[in-house]
A protein has these predicted regions:
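Conserved active-site-proximal phosphate/metal-binding subdomains
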Residues: 152-171, 177-298
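Active-site entrance/lid segments in N-terminal catalytic domains of soluble metabolic enzymes
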Residues: 1-165, 169
């Protein structure tokens, strides 16, 4: 059985986290992931208001008692909204916080006082060192090829590098869409696999059907790494990007651009169908166990 200390600590059946994805991760995904034995998550900002976020948390709590996570984008969120969202995480006893874009120090202290685990995403050793100094419980190593905002270092270099240098649990992010990649990530030293793109093509995901089908139909060469959407380098599906420069301010023309420009990682290469999350997890872990057993046999 594939199992890691962090997986057991969090009470998960499988070493997988469904990564929080802007606009499309939702409460339905969180519950489906929880029931499938993995850690589901969503950005708090996917709820338009703190009141809507409260409703989402209440809906989740009414349907599962299993672990889940909330992503707080601490450096990009209005301070009043961030404070309101964090307070709701405490109120509903969210067990895991996933923090990004900023210094997590003050949030780690508060979260630990409430019994929460905190994992922070990084793309470099420098940022990893700062996060460890802040007291996080683990690092999300976002490698090249990951969907959304991603780094430039291959996960094959980044994960073992951060594992050796930082001495804290590592969550591997980038190009994990099937069981082979789960086994490879664990072999590199990751304790959990941070999977986003594969779950876009799930029935529970909030993405529109055309987005899901584009993930199925795309290959790695259809993914573009650019900073022209938000000013921060990220991976997007080439077919959804407008031609030419986006303008000097790099800002979306209202919310519409964010809904029309679709993110995905190079892991689209291993996405071949749209399935319920429970089936995706079952297939992924069956393949992972088969691969691990085959390697053990030699």
């Amino acid at each position: 059985m594939l199992s890691t200390p962090l997986q057991r600590k969090l009470g998960l059946r499988h070493p997988i986290v469904a990564a929080p994805m802007f606009l499309i991760s939702n409460k339905e995904m969180i519950v489906a992931c929880a029931e499938a034995g993995i850690l589901g998550s969503m950005p708090s900002l996917n709820a338009r208001t703190p009141e809507a976020f409260r409703d989402d948390l209440a809906w989740i709590r009414a349907r599962t008692d299993r672990p889940f996570a909330i992503n707080l984008t601490i450096g990009l969120t209005d301070p009043a909204r961030l404070e309101a969202d964090y307070a709701l995480c405490e109120e509903f006893d969210v067990p895991v916080l996933l923090t990004s874009y900023g210094n997590p120090t003050s949030w780690v202290k508060r979260a630990h006082a409430h019994g929460m685990q905190v994992f922070h995403d990084v793309i470099s050793l420098h940022h990893g060192q700062k996060a460890v100094a802040a007291g996080v419980d683990g690092i999300i190593a976002v490698g090249a090829g990951a969907g959304g905002h991603a780094g430039r270092i291959s996960p094959f270099a980044l994960v073992p590098w951060l594992k050796e240098a930082l001495g804290v649990p590592i969550l591997a992010a980038g190009c994990i869409s099937d069981g082979r990649q789960v086994v490879a990530s664990l072999a590199l030293g990751a304790e959990l696999c941070y999977v986003g793109t594969r779950f876009i093509a799930s029935t529970e995901c909030g993405a529109v059907d055309r987005y899901k089908q584009m993930v199925v139909d795309s290959g790695p060469e259809d993914v573009v790494y650019t900073d022209r959407v938000s000013g921060i380098h990220a991976n997007f599906l080439k077919a959804t990007l407008p031609e030419g420069d986006f303008g000097a301010d790099r800002s979306p023309a209202g919310a519409k651009r964010w809904r029309d420009i679709w993110s995905a990682g190079q892991g689209v290469a291993q996405v071949h169908d749209i399935l319920p999350i429970a089936q995706i997890v079952e297939d992924m872990m069956r393949e992972a166990h088969d691969v691990a057993a085959g390697l053990a046999r030699g």
